[in-house]
Design a protein with these regions (language model features):
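Active-site metal-binding motif and surrounding structural segment of the metallo-beta-lactamase
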Residues: 31, 65-113
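Glycine-rich, histidine-containing beta strand-loop boundary motifs that form or position
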Residues: 52, 61, 86-89, 99, ...
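Conserved beta-strand hairpin/beta-sheet module of binuclear metal-dependent hydrolase folds
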Residues: 25-79
């Protein structure tokens, strides 16, 4: 697990140039805890996870190939079920992994939240 907060602080405070700390957009599917109730999984499009009393709230699900890896990383952190998946936008690299999140807990599917135009984008994906 990388100390993402320390890495970003070093860059913001001018102690290191971005390239000195290695790649900034790493695709390693590793979970880093940012707080006791907050984590990020580094993926093609990162997955942000919040623990709530109702279950996990996630922002984005990565792509189709990364979704299962993101779910696995999250389940190594907590066994809490997914309650809500929020799409920041409808690009396939942010929403393509949703199937893995929906299948993670048999009998319990998360609520999906996204902009009203996401449905039209999905229809276009199905056509192409």
């Amino acid at each position: 697990m990388a100390d993402l907060l320390a890495m970003s602080t070093n860059i913001i405070d001018g102690h290191a140039a971005p390239g000195e700390l290695g790649p900034l957009n790493r695709i390693n599917h590793q979970l880093s805890e940012l707080g006791s109730e907050l984590a990020v999984v580094e993926a093609f499009s990162h997955c942000i996870v919040f623990k709530t009393d109702d279950g996990l709230v996630t922002f984005d699900t990565s792509n189709e190939h990364g979704g299962k890896k993101c779910v696995g990383a999250i389940q190594s952190w907590t066994k809490d079920p997914f309650n809500t998946v929020v799409f920041t936008h409808g690009h396939i690299d942010h929403v393509g992994g949703c199937g893995a999140f929906c299948a993670a807990y048999e009998g319990r599917k998360p609520t999906i939240v996204g902009h009203e135009n996401v449905a039209a984008r999905f229809a276009r994906y199905r056509m192409t």
